[in-house]
Amino acid sequence: MALAEADDGAVVFGEEQEALVLKSWAVMKKDAANLGLRFFLKVFEIAPSAKQMFSFLRDSDVPLEKNPKLKTHAMSVFVMTCEAAAQLRKAGKVTVRETTLKRLGATHLRYGVADGHFEVTGFALLETIKEALPADMWSLEMKKAWAEAYSQLVAAIKREMKPDA
């Protein structure tokens, strides 16, 4: 399944990709809090230094899996990412509110988030989704659909990662 391109060169999220994302999100949505935490624990397993980017984790003695602030943040990020993916084709673009994108861009810039951080997060997201779905639901096409949706969300955040003029 190839990604279609619009006349302006933008990548179009196709019907098949949308169907895969919607089907898998329907399975995962009811367990979003747990999956969000697993997603972040994977990020920290791959890149332990990423914990230092979160003020609420820096001086905390609470184990990550029990940290209420991490649980809340992780669920929020996971749900926003998945909902943005689910709306991508219908809206034709990332549907996170512009004010939210600006805030995300500014926050990611302030904490020095770089391409490598987005790559680790993308890998952790795909692994979390793969583990959350029944084995017969996960496929290369499913992986590509989620990877494309994540890529478009990251591109939207990066567009807002600019220093104040």
Curated annotation (Swiss-Prot):
UniProt motif (Homodimerization) ranges: 45-49, 115-127
Record flagged with keyword Oxidoreductase: yes
Record SUPFAM superfamilies: Globin-like (SSF46458)
Positions that bind heme b: 55, 69, 73, 103, 107-108
Tissue-wise expression: In vegetative but not in embryonic organs.
Name the record gives this protein: Anaerobic nitrite reductase GLB1
Co-factor note (free text): Binds 1 heme group per subunit.
Site feature Homodimerization, where: 143
Enzyme class, UniProt record, top EC level: oxidoreductase
Recorded family membership: Belongs to the plant globin family.
Pfam families per the UniProt record, alphabetical: Globin
The protein's role, per its UniProt record: Phytoglobin that reduces nitrite to nitric oxide (NO) under anoxic conditions (e.g. during flooding or in waterlogged soil). May not function as an oxygen storage or transport protein. Has an unusually high affinity for O(2) through an hexacoordinate heme iron because of a very low dissociation constant.
MF-aspect GO terms: heme binding; metal ion binding; oxidoreductase activity; oxygen binding
Protein location: Cytoplasm; Nucleus
Keyword Cell wall biogenesis/degradation belongs to the record: no
GO cellular component, one term: nucleus
UniProt keyword terms in alphabetical order: Cytoplasm, Heme, Iron, Metal-binding, Nucleus, Oxidoreductase
PANTHER family the UniProt entry points to: LEGHEMOGLOBIN-RELATED, NON-SYMBIOTIC HEMOGLOBIN 3
Domain of life the protein comes from: Eukaryota
Co-factor(s): heme b
Catalyzed chemical reaction(s): Fe(III)-heme b-[protein] + nitric oxide + H2O = Fe(II)-heme b-[protein] + nitrite + 2 H(+)
Record text on subunit structure and interactions: Homodimer.
